[in-house]
Amino acid sequence: MRAARSLAITSICALIATVWADTPQGDLPQRRELQRAALTTSPDMEVITSISEIGKGETIPRHSHHGIETGYVLQGSMVQLPGQAPTMMATGSSFMNLRDVPHAGFTVVGDQPQKLLTVHVVDRGKPLYAWVK
């Protein structure tokens, strides 16, 4: 009986984790965190370095951050915002998104995935993403 109950609880936890990962409340599945550290001059802030790979047909939902995000395009691709013509986000270009300013919402429409290196300087202890509805 205990084994069955443990298995049931484990299954429910796995299901909840899967649902959480598939909803905007969680992290982006395309993002791989490389490093995270406290900002030495401001202990209530942290620096997060990540690589993201967004495949053809994948969409990054509109969101903002509790701090600044800066990035570099490692591999460019054609992207499209809703209601707009496709545009090239070129390899070697950079970007910066300011605190609490919604951005993204694009879909990769080119033949190759888009690869980004991002650095976030954000409020420590808060979620990295604030999803825009």
Residue ranges and their predicted role:
Residues D44-M45, G57-Y72:
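A short beta-loop-beta micro-motif enriched in histidine and acidic residues
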Residues H66-Q84, S93:
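Glycine- and acidic-residue-biased ligand/ion/polar-headgroup-sensing regions
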Residues I54, G83-V101:
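Short acidic-glycine-tyrosine-enriched beta hairpin
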Residues R62, G71-Y72, S94-N97, L117-H120:
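Structural recognition of the beta-strand scaffold that forms the well-ordered cores
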Residues R2-I48, F95-M96, Y129-K133:
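A short, N-terminal "cap"/entry segment at the start of jelly-roll beta-barrel domains
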Residues V101-K126:
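Ligand-binding loop in jelly-roll beta-barrel domains
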Residues I51, E58, L74-M78, P82, ...:
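Sec/Tat-exported extracytoplasmic proteins
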Residues R62, Q80-L81, N97, H103-G110:
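Short beta-strand His + acidic residue motifs that chelate non-heme Fe in jelly-roll/DSBH
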